[in-house]
Amino acid sequence: MDTDTKHKKIKGLFYSALVGDALCLGSHYEYDAQKIYKAYGNKNIERFMGPGEMMGGQTHGIGWGERNYHPGKKAGGTTDYGDYNVLILEHLAKCNQQNEVFTLESLIPHWMDRFENSWGSWICTMTKETYSQLKQNVPLSQVGGFSNAMAIRHLSIYACLSDEETIAHFSREVMFT
């Protein structure tokens, strides 16, 4: 595949993931399929919605109760999962501009700054735990937990790398919470 085609496919992959994430913002953390279907007019999703829109402004996260999990977010915005992908893309761009190699050690200050100053999304239990661990100087090899083991945060790396082992390593690194 030529480089131009590859870059177009990678951009498509990244932006499609963000659009899909934004389409889910309205029902994010709602687990009642009938409630979700009703909120979208008993049909497929046709437009972006704000958090809990058409659901009384709230969704019901298992174990956390009913609330607005993304206060300040608007229709077309991303959930915490989309925000992580944007954060990783920003950090990769910064590494590229400064001619640095991505490391978890270099990501943490960027993540901490965003987390402390402008996150704006739900903060899950393991993210809170990771933040606390970092504040206590727990070694990076020991921070985090298992809640984001299925999170896909590494989409932007495909623009930088092609080696499967390195991509897998990067993917594991960015699942640090």
Please describe what each predicted stretch is.
Residues 1-177:
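Structured, active/binding-site neighborhoods that engage oxygen-rich ligands
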